[in-house]
């Protein structure tokens, strides 16, 4: 039996999952990491904590597999999938981070985005968007780089000395795991920086100059499935656990990894991940589609340096699982995640309330950083069950708006939607989603599709699987999908959407 490992580095934790050649997860270890919030709107991570967590997860998961399988000898290859946009700055001499890493949904760069918009000529910065496929937003890595250069003296000093390295989490992990030998990224992560030309898949000299990001601080861009380097660190006993020099042969941003792990290899196929945020991606084929309706144009995946590049349209929602966690932890509406669906099902509707969970602004397709969390329509009869149900509806309603934009941009209709992520296990949410979209929702029996995507990238490069056709054939043989079909009337659907649109108008609260 051959095994492939996947480092799944997310917003709240790091995991290492080992898959066998039948695409089944056979060993896993997970370690949470600290969420640092030094100021309102800020969220940052300790890069060294993330690196050590990854190493710990690898060592423990491998040890667990050795106990299960006495014949286990090696991991054929390792893939990495990661929270995108979160940006690390480090010194190439010391190999140590120069500050904590601003996370993808951190809002500290709002003033930087206003400054950059002015520098690019004002308006909606269409010049840059036509290169990158992205709007100017606090979301993307380039603005975090610019903020660090202007506000962190150690970063500015390293830049002057020529020792500064910038990278997203994939780059940071590969750099540290390889002992500083691999300073690389992949096309999906690079496409989320606001510095990569989407058509050429190379850094744009013009944008780097305009945003004042020195190109020498950026890593080499590669495909998602090829040799990136070898694991050479012995942090937490990783080298000893692996038993031999193990190649890193896959790297892919988390949402693209979920697209790949959900087998969306063909044009028009789409997936949604219900995680901390909510992320819908549609494969639009080998030609980039530039959105006119508030979506992101991005790289979907590229298998091999000379392989075709498949592009995607993406709609990102900031708060999905984060909304459920807010209700549990901050508001004490329930004590365990399993109670969420039960309470929401205890009422037939929301009794007229609408919840807009814009805790850190609204992303696609609205792009409104001034929006804040809003609940409208409450009365003395409103209960926690109504609020919880309204929160689930809000997640589905935001996704419905994203799908509407995607249909207009891609000129393609959804025939079904593949889903993954923790909230895909919430049956009521899946029912609401199917009814709003009017298509079947396909829920996989094997929920680790994000980690699987990176493992597939690594395994394809290592020869564990020889083609996408073989990957799909194995998946059809080994995995199954539950279908959730639409229900309810068109009148109910339209009424829900109309109330949602009215509630959105009331969310502009923050004075930025």
Curated annotation (Swiss-Prot):
<dbReference type="Pfam" id="PF02782">
    <property type="entry name" value="FGGY_C"/>
</dbReference>
<feature type="binding site">
    <location>
        <begin position="422"/>
        <end position="426"/>
    </location>
    <ligand>
        <name>ATP</name>
    </ligand>
</feature>
<keyword id="KW-0067">ATP-binding</keyword>
<keyword id="KW-0418">Kinase</keyword>
<dbReference type="GO" id="GO:0019563">
    <property type="term" value="P:glycerol catabolic process"/>
</dbReference>
<dbReference type="GO" id="GO:0005524">
    <property type="term" value="F:ATP binding"/>
</dbReference>
<dbReference type="GO" id="GO:0006072">
    <property type="term" value="P:glycerol-3-phosphate metabolic process"/>
</dbReference>
<keyword id="KW-0327">Glycosome</keyword>
<feature type="binding site">
    <location>
        <position position="15"/>
    </location>
    <ligand>
        <name>ATP</name>
    </ligand>
</feature>
<dbReference type="InterPro" id="IPR042018">
    <property type="entry name" value="GK1-3_metazoan-type"/>
</dbReference>
<dbReference type="InterPro" id="IPR043129">
    <property type="entry name" value="ATPase_NBD"/>
</dbReference>
<dbReference type="InterPro" id="IPR018484">
    <property type="entry name" value="FGGY_N"/>
</dbReference>
<feature type="binding site">
    <location>
        <position position="11"/>
    </location>
    <ligand>
        <name>substrate</name>
    </ligand>
</feature>
<dbReference type="GO" id="GO:0046167">
    <property type="term" value="P:glycerol-3-phosphate biosynthetic process"/>
</dbReference>
<comment type="similarity">
    <text>Belongs to the FGGY kinase family.</text>
</comment>
<feature type="short sequence motif" description="Microbody targeting signal">
    <location>
        <begin position="510"/>
        <end position="512"/>
    </location>
</feature>
<keyword id="KW-0547">Nucleotide-binding</keyword>
<feature type="binding site">
    <location>
        <position position="254"/>
    </location>
    <ligand>
        <name>substrate</name>
    </ligand>
</feature>
<dbReference type="GO" id="GO:0005739">
    <property type="term" value="C:mitochondrion"/>
</dbReference>
<feature type="binding site">
    <location>
        <position position="276"/>
    </location>
    <ligand>
        <name>ATP</name>
    </ligand>
</feature>
<dbReference type="GO" id="GO:0006096">
    <property type="term" value="P:glycolytic process"/>
</dbReference>
<keyword id="KW-0576">Peroxisome</keyword>
<keyword id="KW-0319">Glycerol metabolism</keyword>
<feature type="binding site">
    <location>
        <position position="321"/>
    </location>
    <ligand>
        <name>ATP</name>
    </ligand>
</feature>
<comment type="pathway">
    <text>Polyol metabolism; glycerol degradation via glycerol kinase pathway; sn-glycerol 3-phosphate from glycerol: step 1/1.</text>
</comment>
<feature type="binding site">
    <location>
        <position position="84"/>
    </location>
    <ligand>
        <name>substrate</name>
    </ligand>
</feature>
<dbReference type="InterPro" id="IPR005999">
    <property type="entry name" value="Glycerol_kin"/>
</dbReference>
<dbReference type="Pfam" id="PF00370">
    <property type="entry name" value="FGGY_N"/>
</dbReference>
<feature type="binding site">
    <location>
        <position position="139"/>
    </location>
    <ligand>
        <name>substrate</name>
    </ligand>
</feature>
<protein>
    <recommendedName>
        <fullName>Glycerol kinase, glycosomal</fullName>
        <ecNumber>2.7.1.30</ecNumber>
    </recommendedName>
</protein>
<dbReference type="GO" id="GO:0006641">
    <property type="term" value="P:triglyceride metabolic process"/>
</dbReference>
<keyword id="KW-0808">Transferase</keyword>
<dbReference type="InterPro" id="IPR018483">
    <property type="entry name" value="Carb_kinase_FGGY_CS"/>
</dbReference>
<comment type="function">
    <text>Catalyzes the phosphorylation of glycerol using ATP. Under anoxic conditions, when glycerol 3-phosphate accumulates in the glycosome, it catalyzes the reverse reaction, maintaining the ATP balance. Key enzyme for the survival of bloodstream forms under anoxic conditions.</text>
</comment>
<dbReference type="GO" id="GO:0020015">
    <property type="term" value="C:glycosome"/>
</dbReference>
<dbReference type="InterPro" id="IPR000577">
    <property type="entry name" value="Carb_kinase_FGGY"/>
</dbReference>
<dbReference type="GO" id="GO:0004370">
    <property type="term" value="F:glycerol kinase activity"/>
</dbReference>
<keyword id="KW-0324">Glycolysis</keyword>
<dbReference type="InterPro" id="IPR018485">
    <property type="entry name" value="FGGY_C"/>
</dbReference>
């Amino acid at each position: 039996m051959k095994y492939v490992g996947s480092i799944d580095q997310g917003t709240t934790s790091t995991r290492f999952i080992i898959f066998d050649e039948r695409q089944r997860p056979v060993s896993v270890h997970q370690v949470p990491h600290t969420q640092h919030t030094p100021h309102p709107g800020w969220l940052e991570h300790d890069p060294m904590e993330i690196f050590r967590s990854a190493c710990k997860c690898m060592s423990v998961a491998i040890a667990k597999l050795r106990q299960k399988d006495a014949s286990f000898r090696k991991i054929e290859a390792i893939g990495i999938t990661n929270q995108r946009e979160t940006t690390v700055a480090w010194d190439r001499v010391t190999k140590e981070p120069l500050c904590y890493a601003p996370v993808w949904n951190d809002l500290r760069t709002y003033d930087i985005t206003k400054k950059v918009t002015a520098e690019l000529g004002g308006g909606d910065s269409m010049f840059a968007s036509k290169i990158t496929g992205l709007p100017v937003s606090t979301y993307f890595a380039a603005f975090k780089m610019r903020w660090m250069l202007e506000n962190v003296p150690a970063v500015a000093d390293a830049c002057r000395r020529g020792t500064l390295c910038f990278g997203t989490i994939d780059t940071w992990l590969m750099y540290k795991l390889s002992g500083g030998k691999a300073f690389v990224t992949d096309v999906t992560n690079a496409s989320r920086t606001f510095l990569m030309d989407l058509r050429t898949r190379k850094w744009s000299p013009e944008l780097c100059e305009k945003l004042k990001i020195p190109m020498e601080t950026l890593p080499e861009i590669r495909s998602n499935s090829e040799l990136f380097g070898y694991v050479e660190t012995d942090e937490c006993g990783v080298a000893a656990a692996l038993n031999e020099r193990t190649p890193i042969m896959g790297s892919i941003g988390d949402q693209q990894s979920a697209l790949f792990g959900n087998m969306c290899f063909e044009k028009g196929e789409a997936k949604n991940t219900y995680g901390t945020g909510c992320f819908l991606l549609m494969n639009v084929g080998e030609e980039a589609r530039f959105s006119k309706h508030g979506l992101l144009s991005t790289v979907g995946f590229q298998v091999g340096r000379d392989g075709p590049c498949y592009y995607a349209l993406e709609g990102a929602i900031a708060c999905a699982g984060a909304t459920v966690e807010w209700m549990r932890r901050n508001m004490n509406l329930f004590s365990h995640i399993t109670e969420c669906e039960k309470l929401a099902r205890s009422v037939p509707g929301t009794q007229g309330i609408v919840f807009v969970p814009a805790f850190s602004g609204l992303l696609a397709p609205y792009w409104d950083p001034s929006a804040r969390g809003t609940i409208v329509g409450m009365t003395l009869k409103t209960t926690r069950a109504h609020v919880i149900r309204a929160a689930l509806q809000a997640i589905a309603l935001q996704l419905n708006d994203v799908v509407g934009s995607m249909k207009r941009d891609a000129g393609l209709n959804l025939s079904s939607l593949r889903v993954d992520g923790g909230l895909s296990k919430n049956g009521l949410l899946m029912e609401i989603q199917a009814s709003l979209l009017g298509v079947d929702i396909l829920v996989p029996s094997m929920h680790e599709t994000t980690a699987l995507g990176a493992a597939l990238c690594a395994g394809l490069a290592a020869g564990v699987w020889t083609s996408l056709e073989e990957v799909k054939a194995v998946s059809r043989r080994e995995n199954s999908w539950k279908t959730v079909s639409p229900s309810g009337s068109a009148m109910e659907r339209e009424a829900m959407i109309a109330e949602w649109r009215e509630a959105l108008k009331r969310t502009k609260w923050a004075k930025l």
